[in-house]
Amino acid sequence: MNLWHATSPTIWQGRNDLAEADNALRLFQTVKLSPYFTPEEFSHYVALLGFECDEGVKRNQGRPGANQGPDYLRQSLANMASHKGHDKLVDLGSIRANPNQLSEAQQALSDAVTQCQCQNVRTLVLGGGHETAFAHGVGIYDAFPHQRVGIINFDAHLDLRRSPQPTSGTPFRQLAEYCQQHQRLFHYTCIGASLASNTQALVDEANRLNATIIWDNQCRETMLDKVQQQIQDILQQVDLIYMTIDLDVLPAYQMPAVSAPAALGLPLERLLQLIQPICQSGKLQAADLVELNPLFDIQGIGGRAAARLAWQLAHWWY
């Protein structure tokens, strides 16, 4: 497959505790590592797919480095304990973008996602900048042409920018246009957005598209019940969910390893409270974690936070 490569076995390394007990397992021992892109061999698994691309971040005037995110996240995951759901993970490698060829890389990821989904393999994509979302979303729409797809984006930014070329700030505007072209419902919710980080033009665009915005300061602990009810309402309106988590939705002290660290953000514990019902709804078909930039991590804090999110997501998914 174009631009695809297998993950090196050296990425999945960790502490071996099997001398203690047969079930003293870690992810590096239970994640299946495929040398070929063969989703047909892993029906009812969750595929880890890397998207080694930050071309969209560069175009959006961000800090490059997210192309190194997928393997960094894999390494952070490798030594975590393996529990329920983690034995259903298979690493199906990564798409590696060539310089200045964003559209080609996005097409390759879309094709890979569609192939997985058509083989009953759910997709957990590791970005990469948030340009990942356009490719992942198109892959889902193409795999499920007759289903109502809901997009839930946990993100400090609405990512509905107007731009002469695709960037990490345009994916949901692109998906809205894709839906219009294909006569599909565009059902978009952004949770954790910062009003301080989104211009009025972006808010107006969200309103034009009938998007739902739940601002970061509406996700305080005392307001979680209301947010949870909003999430339940969203789940009732669609057949399946594509959930995308831009790691800059976390506060900077928990996630320094992004292009645009958040001054406020949603703390990791609160974010987990919000994603749990989505993961356990039976409607989550695809998810990704994007914008992880190892070049700006501090003592591995960001890598571990991202890994805990991915670990928890997989644990709740099955």
Swiss-Prot record:
Q: How is the cofactor bound?
A: Binds 2 manganese ions per subunit.
Describe the reaction catalysed, as an equation: N-formimidoyl-L-glutamate + H2O = formamide + L-glutamate
Could you tell me the superkingdom of the organism this chain comes from?
Bacteria
Task: Cite the binding residues for Mn(2+) 1.
Answer: 130, 155, 159, 246
Q: Which Pfam families match?
A: Arginase
- A biological process term (GO) from this entry: L-histidine catabolic process to glutamate and formate
Q: What is its EC number?
A: 3.5.3.8
Cofactor or coenzyme needed: Mn(2+)
Q: Name the pathway it acts in.
A: Amino-acid degradation; L-histidine degradation into L-glutamate; L-glutamate from N-formimidoyl-L-glutamate (hydrolase route): step 1/1
PROSITE patterns per record = ARGINASE_1 (PS01053), ARGINASE_2 (PS51409)
Chain positions recorded as Mn(2+) 2 binding sites: 155, 157, 246, 248
Query: What biological function has been recorded for the protein in this entry?
Result: Catalyzes the conversion of N-formimidoyl-L-glutamate to L-glutamate and formamide.
Q: Which family does it belong to?
A: Belongs to the arginase family.
Its protein name is Formimidoylglutamase
User: What organism is the protein native to?
Assistant: Photorhabdus laumondii subsp. laumondii (strain DSM 15139 / CIP 105565 / TT01)
What gene name does this entry carry? Answer: hutG
